[in-house]
Each structure stands twice: as structure tokens, then as C-alpha cells.
Amino acid sequence: LLVLSNSEIATVTGISGAGSFEQYIQYTPAADAEIVSNGKLKTIGVMSDAPSGAATPAVLTRAGLNLSQCAHFLINSGLQIVPGVPYYDLRAKHGYDIRVRPGVPDAPEIRDASRRLAGCCDCDLAVIGETIPGGTTTALCVLRALGYNANVSSSFAANPTALKEKVVREAMYGASISPGSLRDDPMRAVKLFGDPMMPCVVGLTEGFLNSGKEVLLAGGTQMGAVAAILKELNLSDDVVLATTKYVFDDASARFIELVEALEIDAFSAYPDFSKSSISALQKYEQGEVKEGVGAGGAMTLACISGYDQDAYRQEVEAVIKQL
């Protein structure tokens, strides 16, 4: 399942690299959804690649799904621009600027609707990914409100940590909230400082666990923040995280420290794009993009299906060439 969301925080200059051009950044989730579903763009003629020219992680996810032959399902949880492919609409509002108002005022409704949706899904394993520009900043703010002195990753090679911390300080000061003060009220942390992806994934996870399904959260530090919420709700015991080596190895993200603090199982997919002839893929080895669109989970599914690094890389290259 891929959760599609937008947040006004993505429009803070320099905070997100999820899109080729800043003026099109809110189109990124819709473009990612179209690539994952159809392998081609319909809504916008501009690729959702990073400003550096690194390929969108949507191509990594598309390749993993092609190889594993796993079904996928798109969920609109607060989009401003909708994709030209089928999706389930939660009728959620997009995320607001957490510095000036609550980020997700409809968080309880999103959680409830998502929990009901999960109850209607027939599967053994639910792999849940996300695409939301600016999501690492809202993740950082929620983690701080819950009392985790963690860092988050970035789609940029050079993580703009100072800018993210500034946004977090302004948001928490404006809401008169101190670090750790919302540990016993995680959904209030989501409502004040989160984005629409978070209550959706929380609700989906809750619904799947209630019906005896296994849940794999496909993502890095953003899914780490969701795992922190689940932990405080006593829902994290049967949840696993799967991300890419680029997040695991990112010293600025301190992902392993977060996982250890959460006491949750996590593992990493290890692609190798250094052999690729496509420069947009080679940039992953230089620290660009790292994760997103459930890429780590899709790679894991390809691995479970018996495909090695070379086969996976070749499939990603084929997806890019078809675009």
C-alpha cells in the first residue's frame, strides 16, 4: 500500500529535494503514484526526480513490484494534486504549516477511516510505503514531541538539519509544547506537528494487526516516526521496518539509534547502482534521495522473490528507459 500525501512544509525553501523543480514539488506524490502504477507520467510532464538529477525512488518501487508481482494499492490521504490513476480517497485535508497551525486537524478521522479500510483488505503481509515531500521535517517534530532525541534523513546528500531544527523549534514554541511532553498523547503530537500520512499509516497498521495480518513499514526515518507513534499506542510489537542501505548508512540520520530506542526490528535492502550506466541511479551511491515511495520494502519483496542485485538493477534501468 502506498500512502500519498502533501504538506505545506514542503514549500519551505531548501527543506525538500523531492521533485525536480520547487514550483512543482506538490506534484511529486501524484507523479510517483503514476510511475508505480503505470510506469509512465500522466498528470505532469516533469519527472519527480531530485534537483540533483537523481532518479525518483518511484522507479525503484516500480521495479521491485514488477519482479515480485505483488499487488499494490494507492491511498489518497491529503493530496493537493491527485494522480491520473485509480486510488482510494480518504477525503483527508492536506497537511498545514506546523509553524502557524496544527498540521493535521483531522488526524483522528484519518486514523479511523484507515483502520476500517485495512479491515477490508485481504492479504497475508501488508507492506506500507509513503510519498510526501517535506515529511522528514514533520517526522522530526513528532519525534521531538514524543521525547526522542533523534535525527532524520534527507533526500539531499547534504542533510539540511539546521533548517529542519529551526522549523521544529518554531512549531513547538508556537504550540507551547516542550520536547517529550506529548509522549502520553501521541495522536495529539500527530495532530499538532505531523502530516496526513502519519495517521493513515497508524490506522492501517492498527487495522491489519487487529485482523491478524503482519505489517512491514517500508521507509526510513519517516516510518521511524510512525513506529514511535505506534510504540506509544502499544501497537508496535508485531511491526517491522524495512529501508535502504542509504538510510542505514546515513550518519546524519542516526537511524540505527532510533530503531534501538524504539526496540523495533528493522532491516535494510542493499542495492548496488555503482555498476549502472545511468547517472540518475549512480547518484544514490553518492547519498542522494536514499529512500521513499516504499522503495526499501519493494526491494525487499524482490529479494524475497529470488532476485539478486544485478537483476534488480537491470529492472530499475528498464523502468527508467520506459519512462
Which residue ranges define each predicted feature?
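N-terminal loops that bind phosphate or other acidic moieties
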Residues: L1-G129, P133-L323
